[in-house]
Amino acid sequence: MSFKKNKYTVIKQAISKDLAAFVANYFLMQKQVYDTCRQSRYFSPFETIIGYYEGENEQIPNTYSQYANMAMETLLLKCQPGMEKATGLKLYPAYTYARIYKKGDELKRHKDRF
């Protein structure tokens, strides 16, 4: 599949199943820590350093997510060489965003992208 022609490419097995499971479990555990800290009032409901629940006006209301999670940032850097090879481009990592979807959650088309 040509990235230049299609403007996208699929990179199969970009990470191992073990690494995918590790990162998924790590993020699920982080959500548990966040939930425990919030329930125990360990930090302010406005604190977002270890994530937050999206509000009613956001893309997926009442869904745990986080910008710049360290595991996701590390994964981004690990995947960069393979993505550069597949696209033929020099890529500059911008940011990571992770979300834990619940049954019934639906991510609609982004309003800020076409």
Give each language-model segment a name.
Residues 1-86:
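Non-heme Fe(II)/2-oxoglutarate
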Residues 7, 38-41, 99, 109-113:
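Arginine residue identity/basic-tract feature
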Residues 12-13, 100-102:
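Pocket-edge structural micro-motifs
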Residues 87, 92-93, 101-114:
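Catalytic core of non-heme Fe(II) oxygenases with the double-stranded beta-helix
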